Structures are given as C-alpha cells and as structure tokens.
Amino acid sequence: KRAGYDPRRLDAVFVSHLHVDHFGGLPFLFIEFLHRRPREKPLHIAGPPQTEEKVRQLFLLMYGGSPARELPPVCFHILEPDQRATVEGIQVLPFRVPHQTQEISLGLKVQLAGKQILYSGDSAWSELFIDHARGVDLFLCECSFYDRGTGNHVRYIELLNDLPRLECKKLVLTHLGEEMLARKEELAVTVAEDGMVIEI
C-alpha cells in the first residue's frame, strides 16, 4: 500500500517454508481481495506440503469464522524438493535447504522470460547455493548473522569466504538480524531495503 502497488497485479506467491514470518502476510491480502479490491483471476500460492492447511489455519486464527470460510480466488500448488514445477507460467526448481530438522524448508530457483532468480529461503550456508547460483541473474540470499548464530541461518563471514565462488550476476542480502543491521555500512554486498526495485 505504501508504494501504491495494486495487489491485484500479483499473479503468484512462492512460500519457502512455513514459519509465519514467511507467509503471515497472506491473510492481509485475502482481506483486501475479499472486501476492498476483489480479484477476478485466482492468486497462485506455491509452497511446501501443508502450505494450504497452514495458510487457512492462520486466516481463521486472525479473522475468525468457520473452517469453511470463503477465501478469495486462490489456487494452491505443492512444491516438492527437487521436482520442477510451473506455476502461472513461472518455472521453479525447489530444493531442500538446512534450516529445520523435520519440516521442509526450500530454496527456490525461478525462471521467467529468460531471467533466473535464486532465493535461499531461510537456511544455513550450503554448498547448494554455490551450485544453484551459477549463471543466475540475481541471488537473493538470507544473511541473519555476522559471525555468530545458531547454525540454521547464514553467517556473513561464511558467505564472504565463498564470495569468489559465487558465479551469480547480482547478489543481494536479506533477512538481516540486529548485528548485521548494526554493521550494514561495513558489508561488501548489497543489502535489500523495503520497497527496493532490482532490475535484472
């Protein structure tokens, strides 16, 4: 809303994993589509198994009603690791990343109109990113910590060590924690900002 972007222009949303900071905005979109700006075309939502169930549960938790409560026009797609899929004309290769031990967390390599974007999702640093970043136009990589951390998020010093091996055309860091934000001016890599537009 702040950017003046009409959410009806969204064709598809890709969910990397089912932690609420990665899909918690969907109920707000649903309310917008139900009451303020009705959609004619369905919004395609693609994510790991149980995405539809979790999204519906969150919507009911936030706004009430029965399990049969109407959603705006939406179409859910299940993304399985290492199984290519096409969602609303967008080709996607999901792959499992080391973030959770039981539930599935995905990295996503998407292709549209001859351009490729790699998204790490939430993950520890992995050799998978070296492989999948090769030749992509943009690698959007989470980087929660500078040199400390819990082992399930990227640390900047690890990424920096492998920077010469990353053969992507552009690298942008996102999902920064407090330490990373405090040291943002020291970083040798572009950092994502709210409202940022990246041309590829």
Predicted regions and their residues:
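Binuclear metal-dependent hydrolase catalytic cores
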Residues: 1-118, 184-200
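Cap/insert and terminal regions of metallo-dependent hydrolase folds
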Residues: 124-200
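Glycine- and other small-residue-rich loops at beta-strand/loop junctions that grip anionic moieties
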Residues: 48, 121, 174
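Active-site glycine- and acidic-residue-rich loops that bind
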Residues: 118-124
